[in-house]
Amino acid sequence: MQQVQLKLKSFDPVYINQLISLLNDVLDTLEIQNSKEIFLPSKIKKITVIRSPHIHKKSRDQFQIKRYKRSMIISFTNIDILHAFLEICKDLHVVGVQIHISVKYHS
């Protein structure tokens, strides 16, 4: 049995939702029912910048970058379906989403 873990990262949750729905459609066409989605905690990075270069040091701007993360775990029993799924994932070009794929093999 093979197990694939997809880690998805994005700055916009809409892009992750689009990719998840696309992957669920691919899994439905390949007739795979052994998948689960895990919501991971989002990270917030805050940056503070001084507005003025010379005076008024108390005047500051604050920005934040929020990174959303999800994980999908999919179990495969047939190696040919696994190869087909990995080829489809390789050809996916979703803007704004970073995909990390790890494959585990259980004998």
Swiss-Prot record:
GO terms for cellular component: mitochondrion; ribonucleoprotein complex; ribosome. It is found in: Mitochondrion. Coiled coil: none annotated. InterPro entries: Ribosomal_uS10 (IPR001848), Ribosomal_uS10_dom (IPR027486), Ribosomal_uS10_dom_sf (IPR036838). Its main location: mitochondrion. GO terms for biological process: translation. It comes from the Eukaryota. SUPFAM superfamilies: Ribosomal protein S10 (SSF54999). Keywords: Mitochondrion, Ribonucleoprotein, Ribosomal protein. GO terms for molecular function: structural constituent of ribosome. Belongs to the universal ribosomal protein uS10 family. PANTHER family: 30S RIBOSOMAL PROTEIN S10 FAMILY MEMBER. This is Small ribosomal subunit protein uS10m. The lineage of its organism: Eukaryota, Viridiplantae, Chlorophyta, core chlorophytes, Trebouxiophyceae.
